[in-house]
């Protein structure tokens, strides 16, 4: 139903705008609730038991996180009389807010829902969940980061980077792999959030761009699991070859775009004399590199054992839309612009 889809998309835009532009906790909470209610029809749209299950899980987790957030800000208002987002000073409220926003984002140890929900959604809805739905909670985290416990945030960030890489190792479904990739990238964004807000936003924008390029490519080739990646090259060979580079960019390999945020974050952590933290999180990113390499290997180098099956999949003149090609180009070739990005700091 196009009307219902339009209402959902407009509600998503409205909810996100309300949250990121509000100073009052009640308005921020309202925006988050509008977002949650708007995405539910999109998750359950396929009318499949797995989609219904994903929508139910998403609703229960997000409702619990929103309740915790509301409890946090009312507790702060009770003790300090302040409803302003930047005036969150009570320690219990700060702890509750950290838990609430971490649940909204899918940071460890509140990550359990995210891979399951992404697996039950379509690729387009999965893209929204992995990118647009993270923007309002990231904004709230930026606005309140000066009040939050940095030791707790650092531990959560490092465990997110570790678990995001480790849990993705034995996955065969592309959506689950991208979900664990998202958890790992959130760890990188969270670890730098107190020291440099701009850097967190740059990392988030680049992550969204790279993830969008990969989701749209997988949607074009209709690839949902590793075994179908082996035959995807017959549909659009050139796109599949470029997908390998996009995956390696998401892994953070130079000279691709994904190397830029990791380079800047490690540089900033070193400036702040957190060399041990920088070393640990850099080593943990090697776990993620393994499954990105496995995806790239399946996409371009591996052939299925039965040659008769994949020859049937030849598709001639299948067009790739302009958005996908633009995003993939940026995902691969943005690193030369890094001096211009440095000048913004």
Region roles according to the model:
Residues 1-345:
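Core, highly hydrophobic multi-pass alpha-helical transmembrane subunits of bioenergetic inner membranes
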């Amino acid at each position: 139903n196009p009307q219902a889809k339009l209402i959902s998309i407009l509600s998503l835009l409205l909810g996100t705008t309300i949250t990121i532009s509000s100073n009052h906790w009640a308005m921020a909470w309202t925006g988050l609730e509008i977002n949650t209610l708007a995405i539910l029809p999109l998750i359950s749209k396929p009318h499949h038991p797995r989609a219904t299950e994903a929508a139910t899980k998403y609703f229960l987790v997000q409702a619990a996180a929103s309740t915790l957030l509301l409890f946090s800000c009312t507790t702060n208002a009770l003790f300090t009389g302040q409803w302003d987002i930047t005036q969150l000073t009570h320690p219990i409220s700060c702890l509750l807010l950290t838990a609430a926003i971490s649940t909204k984002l899918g940071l460890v140890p509140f990550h359990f829902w995210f891979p399951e929900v992404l697996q039950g959604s379509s690729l387009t809805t999965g893209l929204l969940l992995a990118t647009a739905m993270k923007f309002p909670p990231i904004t709230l985290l930026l606005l309140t980061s000066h009040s939050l416990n940095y030791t707790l945030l650092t531990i959560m960030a490092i465990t997110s980077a570790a678990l995001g890489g480790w849990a993705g190792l034995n996955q065969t479904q592309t959506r689950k792999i991208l979900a664990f990739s998202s958890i790992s990238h959130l760890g990188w964004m969270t670890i730098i959030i107190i020291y440099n807000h701009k850097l967190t936003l740059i990392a988030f924008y680049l992550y969204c761009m790279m993830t969008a390029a990969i989701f749209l490519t997988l949607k074009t080739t209709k690839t949902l699991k590793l075994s179908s990646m082996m035959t995807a090259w017959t549909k659009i060979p050139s796109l599949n070859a470029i997908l390998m580079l996009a995956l390696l960019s998401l892994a953070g390999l130079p000279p691709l775009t994904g190397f830029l945020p990791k380079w800047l974050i490690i540089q900033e952590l070193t400036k702040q004399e957190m060399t041990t933290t920088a070393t640990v999180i850099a080593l943990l990113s090697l776990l993620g590199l393994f499954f990105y390499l496995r995806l790239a290997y399946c996409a371009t180098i591996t052939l299925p054992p039965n040659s008769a099956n994949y020859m049937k999949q030849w598709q001639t003149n299948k067009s790739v839309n302009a958005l996908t090609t633009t995003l993939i180009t940026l995902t691969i070739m943005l690193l030369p612009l890094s001096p211009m990005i440095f000048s913004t700091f």
